[in-house]
């Protein structure tokens, strides 16, 4: 697939997601990095979003719960350029009924070349990177070229 350059803005749109056994860990991480996160727009799936807003006082736009489609809502926002960073504390020891949704979400994040953190250490690296406060040019799929090529064959 052809690619093109796409910019991540200096003020990032950050999605925050956590499986049930990781919600407190994510909340603790958000509290630790509240000052940095205040500089960005925050989004979260259902229960995680309510917990983070209540425990941190941060403004968090909430989607529906992950198992009910929230992971897919976040994925759709990634594919339309409305989410720039994904911080997803998932539980590697607990099988989830919506594992296919999780796999799809991580795939979309990889396709659209956005930073992904899956634990406190990787999230620390992302949030403390100088790039988090800067515009950043990355390679993304050239959807227009893709459609032009596909429709040529019709």
Swiss-Prot record:
Residues 6-154 form the MGS-like domain. The keyword Lyase applies. Belongs to the methylglyoxal synthase family. Substrate binds at residues 19, 23, 45-48, 65-66, 98. One of its GO terms (molecular function) is methylglyoxal synthase activity. It comes from the Bacteria. The gene is mgsA. NCBIfam families: MGSA, PRK05234.1. Transmembrane segments: none annotated. The active site is at residue 71. It comes from Saccharophagus degradans (strain 2-40 / ATCC 43961 / DSM 17024). PANTHER family: METHYLGLYOXAL SYNTHASE (PTHR30492:SF0). Catalyzes the formation of methylglyoxal from dihydroxyacetone phosphate. GO terms for cellular component: cytosol. It holds the Pfam family MGS. This is Methylglyoxal synthase. Coiled coil: none annotated. One of its GO terms (biological process) is methylglyoxal biosynthetic process. Its EC number is 4.2.3.3. Keywords: Lyase. It catalyses: dihydroxyacetone phosphate = methylglyoxal + phosphate.
